[in-house]
């Protein structure tokens, strides 16, 4: 039988040799994690971009059929470097895995619908570190424009934060996707709303950068009457942009993606703000 003294010596040895070092390591790891997080936020605040936005291990893959759809249907994906294409494919796969796709009015959801919609969301958030949208868990797809019992109007698309859903008329989504230079793209517009709303409700690094950029954009416009007048007079942005701040950003986003050269040429400061908000440094942007 071990004596009390020997037991105490054994316990003290156990504490000093194992428990204390483990405790120090745990505290050290926690402190290091907090310091890294503080550094990342400081870096983002100063340079207006995340320290890093992409992961380089354990990347998901699409099925062969889904990959062919992505490659054939999405010009933005084709213009990326091979390294960025791997990241893009991973994020499209994650969107499909983590969101529920629901066909309405007996619509059968296909891989084309899943990949094309997921690729639009991925494109817009590709510069984000935290790219998954908390306010979207369900993608509802109607065959065409649908009637809303709430406001008694036909809709082509909407974001419903209460239901954590984004809704599309597939006919109109596809039409906007197929014509890439008319600045009318339902998918970009509605995901623009989702990104804007998501950033307003979060404090991650990408949301911080987005919100700072949007505040900079609105301050710039409020303090430059001539720019506001030029915006309206140019008719480059459709009139719907001036409905409210959310529609303004969503319309600007359509133009930013579909006609970036013209956007940059006509309104370079706005273009710079948009590019910074999205951390968009890909393809020809």
Say what each PLM segment does.
Residues 137-138, 164-166, 184:
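Generic beta-strand structural signal
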Residues 81, 182-199, 250:
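Active-site recognition of the HExxH zinc-binding catalytic motif
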Residues 134-146, 151:
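Short, His- and charge-rich active-site/binding loops that engage polyanionic ligands
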Residues 28, 180-184, 246:
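Hydrophobic (often cysteine-bearing) scaffold residues that line and stabilize catalytic clefts
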Residues 2-10, 116-128, 146-156, 160-162, ...:
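Metalloprotease/metallohydrolase-associated module, dominated by Zn2+-dependent proteases
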Residues 1-134, 200-220, 271-285:
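N-terminal low-structure segments adjacent to metalloprotease catalytic domains
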Residues 19, 76, 80, 105, ...:
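Conserved aromatic-histidine-acidic binding/catalytic patches
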């Amino acid at each position: 039988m071990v004596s009390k003294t020997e037991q105490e010596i054994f316990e003290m040895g156990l504490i000093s040799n194992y428990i204390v070092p483990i405790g120090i390591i745990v505290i050290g790891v926690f402190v290091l994690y907090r310091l890294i997080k503080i550094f990342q936020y400081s870096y983002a605040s100063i340079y207006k971009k995340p320290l890093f936005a992409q992961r380089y291990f354990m990347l998901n893959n699409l099925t062969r059929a889904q990959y062919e759809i992505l490659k054939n249907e999405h010009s933005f994906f084709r213009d990326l470097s091979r390294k960025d294409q791997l990241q893009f494919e991973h994020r499209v796969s994650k969107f499909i895995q983590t969101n529920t796709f629901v066909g309405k009015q007996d619509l059968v959801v296909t891989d084309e619908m899943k990949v094309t919609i997921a690729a639009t969301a991925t494109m817009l958030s590709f510069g984000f570190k935290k790219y998954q949208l908390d306010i979207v868990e369900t993608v509802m797809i109607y065959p065409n424009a649908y009637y809303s019992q709430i406001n008694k109007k036909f809709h082509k698309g909407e974001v419903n934060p209460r239901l954590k859903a984004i809704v599309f008329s597939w006919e109109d989504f596809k039409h906007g996707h197929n014509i890439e230079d008319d600045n009318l793209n339902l998918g970009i517009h509605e995901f623009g709303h989702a990104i804007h709303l998501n950033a307003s409700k979060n404090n991650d690094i990408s949301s911080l950068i987005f919100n700072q950029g949007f505040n900079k954009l609105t301050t710039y416009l409020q303090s430059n009457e001539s720019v506001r007048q030029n915006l309206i007079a140019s008719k480059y942005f459709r009139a719907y942009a001036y409905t409210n701040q959310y529609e303004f950003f969503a319309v600007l986003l359509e133009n930013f993606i579909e006609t970036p050269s013209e956007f940059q040429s006509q309104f370079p400061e706005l273009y710079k703000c948009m590019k910074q908000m999205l951390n968009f440094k890909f393809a020809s942007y």
